[in-house]
From Swiss-Prot:
Biological role: DNA-dependent RNA polymerase catalyzes the transcription of DNA into RNA using the four ribonucleoside triphosphates as substrates.
Keyword Repressor: no
Entry EC number(s): 2.7.7.6
Family per record: Belongs to the RNA polymerase beta chain family.
Gene for this chain: rpoB
Molecular function in Gene Ontology: DNA binding; DNA-directed RNA polymerase activity; ribonucleoside binding
Protein name per its UniProtKB record: DNA-directed RNA polymerase subunit beta
UniProt source species: Chlamydia caviae (strain ATCC VR-813 / DSM 19441 / 03DC25 / GPIC) (Chlamydophila caviae)
SUPFAM superfamilies for the chain: beta and beta-prime subunits of DNA dependent RNA-polymerase
GO cellular component: DNA-directed RNA polymerase complex
C-alpha cells in the first residue's frame, strides 16, 4: 500500500499537538452562520438565525398587523461546484423563510422564497459567477472600552477613554487641562462636548448626594464639640445638611467643611455628618459638581439635548427619547457579546452568561469607566492604559460574521418596505398574506454586492496549493470598517509582542500593504469572541504536562512562558534551573520554578508558508519574507518532485489545501482509472464510494489542475490516506519546484546581479516545463438586426483557414493553434449604416438582396499558442421549433431518466431501512416519540422496536418527530437528516436533468442563444528571462541557457545543472540557502529525504558529519572543471542540491512588440502597455541620450514622422511605397496639444513662420 515517504530528522520527539485543520477559520465560521443540517428548533441564536430574530417581529405603525419570523429552510445546490465553474454560475442554495402574519382577519402562516445564498465548498471557497472566490477575514478594532493618554501642549498628560460599540454611537470621555472630564459623542469633538457630571445626571443620578455615594466611600462622623473640628475641617460633605424643622441648609453635598460651617451646625444641634472619604476639593468629581450648571435629572437631560441638537426645542420627552435611542435601544446601540466581554473584563464586572448577553450600555458601565479614568489620573498602579495594537484589542471578523452584517443591513432595508406596505394595504379589497408584503430583493442585492464587489471578497489566488491555502488564512486590516492604507501608520503595521503564535511576523506583502495584510500562525485558532488564541502546555510544580490551554493575548499577559526548545528530562521536568521565557512581551532568563506555561512547538510562531522554509533560523527576516511570498508564486510543474530538504509540513499543507484526494473511510480499492477511484468501505463493502478526479481543469491563475491516482486495485486504505496526487504535489507532499545541482561561482559574467545560468539538460528533461490553460469564450445573441449565428460559412475567408473548424464552425479538439487562427466562426447581421454609399445605391436600384453579414469570429489573441484541449457548448432549446423526431427522442430520454430516478430512490430507501433496522430492531425505546403536529404518541417509552414500528417511523419526516435528547435518538436524527438531504438532492438532480432535456441550458444570460468556451493548453518550457527563486528569498532571472558540454563539471564528469552568484549570499544574509545546499548534497548522496523543521533543524555539526559519512568534502566545496576548456578552476566551489522554483512571472507573458496598433486620440501617439497593443515610449531621457551624440536627423525623425506628426506619417508611408528617400516633417500633434492647453489658460500662442 502506498504511504507518504518518511523523512529523516534530528528532532528528539514529535510535537505534543497536531496542527489544527488549516482552513477551519473559513469552514467553521460559515457553518456557524448557516447552521446547515440543524433542525429549526435546534438552531442557536447566531448567524442568520440571530439576524432574523433581531429584525422580526415587524409591527405596523398602528400595531394592528404583526409579521413574525418562525424558521428558515435551505434547499440543496442545483449543480456541483465543478459544474458551476463550467457554466459560469453561482454555487448556491435557495432560502425559504416561514412567516406568521397576524392581523384583524386572523393568523396566516406561509413559506416565502427569499432568493439564494452562496454556499461554501468543502475547500472553504465560494463560486460566484463561475469564479472561485475567498472571503478574507478582517482584523479590526474590538468593540469594548479603551483607556488612552495624550500629552497636552503645556506638558500635562490627559487621560481619556472610549467605549466603542459593535453598532452605534461612540462614547468618549477626556480630561481637560483643569482636571474636568468632558464627554464627546460620536467623535464630533467641538459641537458635542458635555460635562461628565451633566451626563451622569442625565442617566438618572439626579442629586449630588447620589453621585458622591457612587464615587466615594461614605463614613458617618460625630460632631459633639469643637474638638472634632480638627478631624472634619477640609473634608467633603457626602449629603446635604439641613434643619428638618426650618428647612435651613447648613451645608450642601460636595461642599468643603470650614470651621464657620461646623460652628453653625454645632449650634443647630447636628450631631452626625456624612463624609466622603478620600475626597478633597481638587478631586475631579468634586470640581465637576461645583462646575455643573444643572442640579436635577430633568435639567441635565435638557442641557444634554441642547448641546447635542442645538437649535431644536429641548422638551423633556425629546431629550429622554434621544438618550434612550443613543445608548439604551438594542436596535440602534449594540456592544455585542465581544464588547460586553471586553468592558466587563476591564472594569472588573462579573463574566456570567446573563451579564454577557446585555448588549446595550448600562449606567454602571459609565460610572465604572469614569471611576477607572479617575484612578488612572490619581496614579493608581493597578489601572493601566490600553495598547490599541495589542491583539487583546483587535479581533477577527471571519466570513460568517461579515456576511451576517450584510444580511442585517439587507433585512433592515426590507423591514422599512414591509412596514410601508402594511400601512398602504387595502384590507377591503384583498386579504393580506406574508408573500404580498415581503420583498426578497433587499437581501439578494446586498449579498450579490458583497460577494461581487466587497474589498474582502477576493478572486482566489490559485497559482499553487500553498497560494490557495494562504489566501484562506489571510487576515486583512483593510476593507469596510477597517483601516485605510493611506492613513495607516507605522505602529499598526509593525510586529507586536502579542502576535507571538497568533499572527506570523514574517509573511506579509512588500509594498503599500505591508503589515496590513498578514497571515494566521500555524497553530492559531479564533475563539467565539473573534480573538486569536494560541496553544500552550501547562506547567504544574515544575512538571511540563501534556495538557493544552488555548490562550488569548490578554490572558497570556499574566503568564511566564518557556520556549518549546527548553531542555526537559524523562519526567518532563526542566533540566536547567533557568530557561529563556516570555512575560508581558519581554524575553528574559527566568527561574524554571516561576514558569507557568510552555510553547507547544517552535513553529507556532510562524505561518504555514514560512514554516515550509528549511533553516529559516539562519535567514534574515526580510529575505524570509520574500521566500514566503515567492513560494506562493511557484508554478506547478509537469513533472513534480518533492524537496530533498523539507520541514515536515509539506504533507499537511498539501492535504489541507484540498489539492490532493484523501480517503474519507477505511476500505479496499475496488477500481482505479485516470478519472476516478472507487473504494469499497470496510464496514459495508456493498456501498461503494467513488472519488472523482479533476482532469486538466483551468485554475484561476491559468495553471493546470490535474489529479493522478496513487493507489492500485486491491490496496487496503485507511481513513486519511492520500489516494491521488494533485497539482504541485508528489506522493502526497507539496512539490513546488525541483532539486537542482548548483554551484555558487561566477561564470563569464553571466550571473551578474543575481542572474541565473542553467544547463540545457534541464530543458531537455522538461524539468521546469509547465502547462498553462487559456479559456476563450464566444456568445451568439439575438440582436435587433437578427440572430447571430455560429457557423463555418464565414464571408471572405479561405478554405485553408477553416481547415480545423468542424461542421458547426467550432474548432476540433487537438488542433494546434497560433495567433490569428479562428477558434469559433460567427457571423452577425450588418446594419444599414455599415454599407458603403455605392452599395446602398445598388440596393435602391435592384431591391433588397439577402441581408449582408459580417465576420465576428473568435480568434486566438497575440502571444498565445497551443493545442485545443476542450470545447464546451451551451445552448437554449426553443420548444416551439422542435421537430416531431426531436420530440419523440426527448420523450424516450425523459422516460429513461424517470426510470433511473425511481431506481435510485428505491435503493436509497432500502439503505435507509437497513440502517434503521440495525439501529433500532429489538431495542427498547428510551423515551416516547411524539408527532409534533397531531400530538399523537408514535412510540411509547419502553416499547421494543419491531419491524412494524420501524416502518411507521420510516414514513415520517424529521420536522414532525419530537424526540427527547438521548444517544439513540441523536443517531436516529442524524440518519433521518442524511436520508432526507440525499432524497432532496436526488430530486433536485432529476428536475435539473429534465429541465436540461426540455429547455437546454436555461441559465444562460438573457438574449444569449448559444455560448461556446474553447480551452487552449500551451506548454511553457524554461527560457531566458523567466524568473526563478529558492525558498530563502534568493530570486533571479535566467540569463543564459548553456549547452550541457559547456557547463562546469565535477571530477567524476557530472555537470552542474545551475550556477548561482556567490555575491548574492553575504549582503542578503540568507545563509539558509548554503546550509540547504550542503544538507541536500549529503541527503541526495545517501538517497534519503530529510526534514529540518524551523528552529529545531539540523545543526551545522550534524551536516558536516553526514557529508563525511557520504565521502563528500567536509567543507562542502569541490574543484570544478570548465566545460569549455577542460581546465580546473583555481578555487574550490560550494556545490550541492538546492530546491529551486519557477515563478509565475514568465517572460512569454511579458515580452511584447508592436508594428501597427492603436493611437491616442488627443496626442496621436501610440498607446502604452501590452494589453493595448501599445508601443515603447521614446521619452525625454532617451532623447537626451541621442542629443549627447548629436544625431539631429535621427532625432527629428523619431520625434515627428515616427511618432505623432499626422500628415508626415502619411507622406513618409507614401515615399517608402514609392521607393523615394525624402523626409519632410511637420508639426507634432503633441505640440498642437500644448498650444491648445495654453490657449485654454488665456495665452494666445501661435507658431509664426519667420523668413530666414
Amino acid at each position: 500500500m502506498f504511504k507518504c515517504p518518511e523523512r529523516v530528522s534530528v528532532k528528539k520527539k514529535e510535537d505534543i499537538l497536531d496542527l489544527p485543520n488549516l482552513i477551519e477559520i473559513q469552514i467553521k465560521s460559515y457553518k456557524q452562520f448557516l447552521q446547515i443540517g440543524k433542525l429549526a428548533e435546534e438552531r442557536d441564536n447566531v448567524g442568520l438565525e440571530e439576524v432574523f430574530r433581531e429584525i422580526f417581529p415587524i409591527k405596523s405603525y398602528n400595531e394592528a398587523t404583526i409579521l413574525e419570523y418562525l424558521s428558515y429552510n435551505l434547499g440543496v445546490p442545483k449543480y456541483s461546484p465543478e459544474e458551476c465553474i463550467r457554466r459560469g454560475i453561482t454555487y448556491s442554495v435557495t432560502l425559504k423563510v416561514r412567516f406568521r402574519l397576524t392581523d384583524e382577519t386572523g393568523i396566516k402562516e406561509e413559506e416565502v422564497y427569499m432568493g439564494t445564498i452562496p454556499i461554501m465548498t468543502d475547500k472553504g471557497t465560494f463560486i460566484i459567477n463561475g469564479a472561485e472566490r475567498v472571503i478574507v477575514s478582517q482584523v479590526h478594532r474590538s468593540p469594548g472600552i479603551n483607556f488612552e493618554q495624550e500629552k497636552h501642549s503645556k506638558g500635562n498628560i490627559l487621560f481619556s477613554f472610549r467605549i466603542i460599540p459593535y453598532r452605534g454611537s461612540w462614547l468618549e470621555a477626556i480630561f481637560d487641562i483643569n482636571d474636568l472630564i468632558y464627554i464627546h459623542i460620536d467623535r464630533k469633538k467641538r459641537r458635542r462636548k458635555i460635562l461628565a457630571m451633566t451626563f451622569i445626571r442625565a442617566l438618572g443620578y439626579s442629586s449630588d448626594a447620589d453621585i458622591i455615594e457612587e464615587f466615594f466611600q461614605i463614613e458617618e462622623r460625630s460632631l459633639k464639640s469643637e474638638k472634632d473640628f480638627t478631624l472634619l475641617v477640609g473634608k467633603i460633605l457626602a449629603d446635604n445638611v439641613l434643619d428638618e424643622s426650618s428647612s435651613l441648609v447648613y451645608g450642601k453635598a460636595g461642599e468643603k467643611l470650614s470651621t464657620a460651617m461646623l460652628k453653625r451646625m454645632l449650634d443647630a444641634d447636628i450631631s452626625t455628618l456624612k463624609i466622603a472619604v478620600e475626597a478633597d476639593e481638587n478631586h475631579p468629581i468634586i470640581k465637576m459638581l461645583a462646575k455643573d450648571p444643572t442640579d436635577s435629572y430633568e435639567a441635565a437631560l435638557k442641557d444634554f439635548y441642547r448641546r447635542l441638537r442645538p437649535g431644536e426645542p429641548a422638551t423633556l420627552a425629546n431629550a429622554r427619547s434621544t438618550i434612550m435611542r443613543l445608548f439604551f435601544d438594542s436596535k440602534r446601540y449594540n456592544l455585542g457579546r465581544v464588547g460586553r466581554y471586553k468592558l466587563n473584563r476591564k472594569l472588573g464586572f462579573p463574566m456570567d452568561e446573563e451579564t454577557l448577553s446585555q448588549v446595550t450600555l448600562r449606567k454602571e458601565d459609565v460610572i465604572g469607566a469614569l471611576k477607572y479614568l479617575i484612578r488612572l489620573k490619581m496614579g493608581d498602579e493597578r489601572a493601566s492604559i490600553d495598547d490599541i495594537d495589542h491583539l487583546a484589542n483587535r479581533r477577527v471578523r471571519s466570513v460568517g460574521e461579515l456576511i451576517q452584517n450584510q444580511c442585517r443591513s439587507g433585512l433592515a432595508r426590507m423591514e422599512k418596505i414591509v412596514r410601508e406596505r402594511m400601512n398602504l394595504f387595502d384590507f377591503s379589497s384583498d386579504t393580506l398574506i406574508p408573500g404580498k408584503i415581503i420583498s426578497a430583493k433587499g437581501l439578494a442585492s446586498v449579498l450579490k454586492d458583497f460577494f461581487g464587489r466587497s474589498q474582502l471578497s477576493q478572486f482566489m489566488d490559485q497559482t499553487n496549493p500553498v497560494a490557495e491555502l494562504t489566501h484562506k488564512r489571510r487576515l486583512s486590516a483593510l476593507g469596510p470598517g477597517g483601516l485605510n492604507r493611506e492613513r495607516a501608520g507605522f505602529e499598526v503595521r509593525d510586529v507586536h509582542a502579542s502576535h507571538y503564535g497568533r499572527i506570523c511576523p514574517i509573511e506579509t506583502p512588500e509594498g503599500p500593504n505591508i503589515g496590513l495584510i498578514t497571515s494566521l500562525s500555524s497553530f492559531a485558532k479564533i475563539n467565539e469572541f473573534g480573538f486569536i488564541e494560541t496553544p500552550y502546555r501547562i506547567v504544574r510544580d515544575g512538571v511540563v504536562t501534556d495538557e493544552i490551554e488555548y490562550m488569548t493575548a490578554d490572558v497570556e499577559e499574566e503568564c511566564v512562558i518557556a520556549q518549546a526548545s527548553a531542555a526537559l528530562d524523562e519526567y518532563n521536568m526542566f533540566v536547567d534551573p533557568v530557561c529563556w521565557a516570555r512575560c508581558r512581551g519581554e524575553a528574559f532568563e527566568a527561574d524554571t520554578s516561576t514558569v507557568t506555561h510552555m510553547d507547544v512547538s517552535p513553529k507556532q510562531l510562524v505561518s504555514i508558508v514560512t514554516g515550509l522554509i528549511p533553516f529559516l533560523e539562519h535567514d534574515d527576516a526580510n529575505r524570509a519574507l520574500m521566500g514566503s511570498n515567492m513560494q506562493r508564486q511557484a508554478v506547478p510543474l509537469l513533472k513534480t518532485e518533492a524537496p530533498i530538504v523539507g520541514t515536515g509540513l509539506e504533507a499537511r499543507a498539501a492535504k489541507d489545501s484540498g489539492a490532493i484526494v484523501v480517503a474519507e473511510e477505511d476500505g479496499v480499492v475496488d477500481y482505479v482509472d485516470g478519472y476516478k477511484v472507487v473504494i469499497a468501505p470496510k464496514h459495508n463493502p456493498t456501498l461503494k464510494r467513488t472519488y472523482d478526479l479533476k482532469k486538466f481543469l483551468r485554475s484561476n491563475s491559468g495553471t493546470c489542475i490535474n489529479q493522478r491516482p496513487l493507489c492500485s486495485v486491491g490496496d487496503v486504505i485507511v481513513k486519511g490516506d492520500v489516494i491521488a496526487d494533485g497539482p504541485a504535489t508528489d506522493q502526497g507532499e507539496l512539490a513546488l519546484g525541483k532539486n537542482i545541482l548548483v554551484a555558487f561561482m561566477p561564470w563569464y559574467g553571466y550571473n551578474f546581479e543575481d542572474a541565473i545560468i542553467i544547463s540545457e539538460k534541464l530543458i531537455k528533461q522538461d524539468a521546469y516545463t509547465s502547462i498553462y490553460i487559456e479559456e476563450f469564450e464566444l456568445t451568439a445573441r439575438d440582436t435587433k438586426l437578427g440572430k447571430e449565428e455560429i457557423t463555418r460559412d464565414i464571408p471572405n475567408v479561405s478554405e485553408e483557414v477553416l481547415a480545423n473548424l468542424g461542421e458547426d464552425g467550432i474548432i476540433r479538439i487537438g488542433a494546434e493553434v497560433k495567433p490569428g487562427d479562428i477558434l469559433v466562426g460567427k457571423i452577425t447581421p450588418k446594419s444599414e449604416t455599415e454599407l458603403a454609399p455605392e452599395e446602398r445605391l445598388l440596393r435602391a436600384i435592384f431591391g433588397e438582396k439577402a441581408a449582408d453579414v459580417k465576420d465576428a469570429s473568435l480568434t486566438v489573441p497575440p502571444g498565445t499558442e497551443g493545442v485545443v484541449m476542450d470545447v464546451k457548448v451551451f445552448s437554449r432549446k426553443d420548444r416551439l421549433s422542435k421537430s416531431d423526431d426531436e420530440l419523440v427522442e426527448e420523450a424516450v430520454h425523459l422516460k429513461d431518466l424517470q426510470k433511473g430516478y425511481k431506481n435510485q430512490v428505491s435503493v436509497l430507501k432500502t439503505e435507509y431501512r437497513e440502517k434503521l433496522g440495525a439501529l433500532l430492531l429489538n431495542e427498547k425505546a428510551p423515551a416516547s416519540i411524539i408527532h409534533r403536529r397531531t400530538a399523537d404518541i408514535l412510540v411509547q417509552e419502553g416499547t421494543v422496536f419491531d419491524q412494524e414500528t420501524i416502518e411507521l417511523l420510516e414514513q415520517e419526516s424529521l420536522v414532525d418527530l419530537l424526540m427527547p435528547p438521548c444517544e439513540m435518538y441523536d443517531v436516529l436524527k442524524g440518519l433521518l437528516s442524511d436520508y432526507e438531504t440525499s432524497l432532496q438532492r436526488l430530486e433536485v438532480n432529476y428536475k435539473t436533468e429534465v429541465e436540461h432535456i426540455r429547455e437546454g441550458d436555461a441559465d444562460l444570460d438573457h438574449g444569449v442563444i448559444r455560448q461556446v468556451k474553447v480551452y487552449v493548453a500551451s506548454k511553457r518550457k524554461l527560457q531566458v528571462g523567466d524568473k526563478m527563486a529558492g525558498r530563502h528569498g534568493n530570486k533571479g532571472v535566467v540569463s543564459k541557457i548553456v549547452p550541457e558540454a559547456d557547463m562546469p563539471y565535477l571530477a567524476n564528469g557530472e555537470t552542474v545543472q545551475m550556477i548561482l552568484n556567490p555575491l548574492g549570499v553575504p549582503s542578503r544574509m540568507n545563509l539558509g540557502q548554503v546550509l540547504e545546499t550542503h544538507l541536500g548534497y549529503a541527503a541526495k548522496t545517501a538517497g534519503i529525504h530529510v526534514k529540518t523543521p524551523v528552529f529545531e533543524g539540523f545543526p551545522e555539526s550534524r551536516i558536516w558529519d553526514m557529508m563525511i559519512e557520504q565521502g563528500l568534502p567536509a567543507d562542502g566545496k569541490s574543484y570544478l572543471y570548465d566545460g569549455k576548456t577542460g581546465e580546473r578552476f583555481d578555487n574550490t566551489v560550494v556545490i550541492g542540491y538546492i530546491y529551486m522554483l519557477k515563478l509565475s512571472h514568465l517572460i512569454a507573458d511579458k515580452i511584447h512588440a508592436r508594428s501597427i496598433g492603436p493611437y491616442s486620440l488627443v496626442t496621436q501617439q501610440p498607446l502604452g502597455g501590452k494589453a493595448q497593443m501599445g508601443g515603447q515610449r521614446f521619452g525625454e531621457m532617451e532623447v537626451w541620450a541621442l542629443e549627447a551624440y548629436g544625431v539631429a536627423h535621427m532625432l527629428q525623425e523619431i520625434l515627428t514622422v515616427k511618432s505623432d506628426d499626422v500628415s508626415g506619417r502619411t507622406r513618409i508611408y507614401e515615399s517608402i511605397v514609392k521607393g523615394e528617400n525624402l523626409l519632410k516633417s511637420g508639426t507634432p500633434e503633441s505640440f498642437n496639444v500644448l498650444i491648445k492647453e495654453m490657449q485654454g489658460l488665456g495665452l494666445d500662442v501661435r507658431p509664426m513662420v519667420v523668413d530666414a
